[in-house]
Amino acid sequence: MSIQNEMPGYNDVYQLLNQQGVGLTPAEMHGLISGLLCGGNTDSSWQPLVHDLTNEGLAFGHELAQALRNMHSAISDSLDDDGFLFQLYLPEGDAVSVFDRADALAGWVNHFLLGLGVSQPKLDKVKDETGEAIDDLRNIAQLGYDEDEDQEELEMSLEEIIEYVRVAALLCHDTFARQQPTAPEVRKPTLH
């Protein structure tokens, strides 16, 4: 991945969203953009969709718009690389509790499903493995926890859920966004 398409810093995006009065976390914004991309929205229409869904249709200021374009490019690059580089964008560090990460995951999944649904309006009709994964994501979006739970155990469970969500997002991308191989064009013989 080129330097130009690196993911902007989580705290930087958080500050830019707050400055613009956008009521989303960086995890939620990443989930929304990921959902749009995994749903097959690969053209520039993603920007007005994000404006409509998050900012009452108003464009963002230059700095936030640039950070989100960088985020979009980085997500797109990571998905196009067979998904090996694709990761959920969640807060990290010693100051971030497992509960904060669980809340961020639930927000990421909710907004991923929103973006996916905007790109694929008949999402409830999807069957097979992808349909099951989408149903699982709906359940994960309702994620709850008990603050009295063992934090180490919760952290391990959370990491497993994060990996499952990552794989489910990649499955959606493979289903909706990958170019399906087409049959070779059949030409009718030409009569001379």
Swiss-Prot record:
InterPro entries: YgfB-like, YgfB-like_sf. HAMAP family: UPF0149 (MF_00346). Coiled coil: none annotated. This is UPF0149 protein KPN78578_32810. One of its GO terms (cellular component) is cytosol. Belongs to the UPF0149 family. It comes from the Bacteria.
